């Protein structure tokens, strides 16, 4: 079974590119990472930084998560991210996404030993 940490990497990490390559980036990535298998995942963020840099956020600024839990952490520096948002015309199984590139601070929830990101909470 996929671990929470591995799921975070599959859903949110794209260290191989420094930014979204094209407007078609989200359509390709959401499909290749199996985020459109059973339904169209409405919103998803990919982080274009090294895994080590993203894992390091777990020892940075402790903040409250959206759901009220206290195991969220905000990155000290901005990171290159791509937001994927489902378009109005998107219909499963033909999921369609708008690709938006940004440089923002990320907020992730961390747990486990080693203490690693398991959930992408927000970008600010």
UniProtKB/Swiss-Prot annotation:
Pancreas. Glycans are attached at residue 34. It catalyses: an [RNA] containing cytidine + H2O = an [RNA]-3'-cytidine-3'-phosphate + a 5'-hydroxy-ribonucleotide-3'-[RNA]; an [RNA] containing uridine + H2O = an [RNA]-3'-uridine-3'-phosphate + a 5'-hydroxy-ribonucleotide-3'-[RNA]. Pfam families: RnaseA (PF00074). Disulfide bonds join 26-84, 40-95, 58-110, 65-72. Residues 1-13 have a biased composition (Basic and acidic residues). GO terms for molecular function: lyase activity; nucleic acid binding; ribonuclease A activity. Residues 1-22 are annotated as: Disordered. It is found in: Secreted. The active site is at residues 12, 119. Endonuclease that catalyzes the cleavage of RNA on the 3' side of pyrimidine nucleotides. Acts on single-stranded and double-stranded RNA. Belongs to the pancreatic ribonuclease family. Monomer. Interacts with and forms tight 1:1 complexes with RNH1. Dimerization of two such complexes may occur. Interaction with RNH1 inhibits this protein. This is Ribonuclease pancreatic. The gene is RNASE1.
């Amino acid at each position: 079974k996929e671990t929470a940490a591995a799921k975070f990497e599959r859903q949110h990490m794209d260290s191989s590119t420094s930014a979204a390559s094209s407007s078609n980036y989200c359509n390709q990535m959401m499909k290749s990472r199996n985020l459109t298998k059973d339904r169209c995942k409405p919103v998803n963020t990919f982080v274009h930084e090294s895994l080590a840099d993203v894992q390091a956020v777990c020892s940075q600024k402790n903040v409250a998560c959206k759901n009220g839990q206290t195991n969220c952490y905000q990155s000290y520096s901005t990171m290159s991210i791509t937001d994927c948002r489902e378009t109005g015309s998107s219909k499963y199984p033909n999921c369609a996404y708008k690709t938006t590139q940004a440089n923002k601070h990320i907020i992730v929830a961390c747990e486990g030993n080693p203490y690693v990101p398991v959930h992408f909470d927000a970008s600010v």
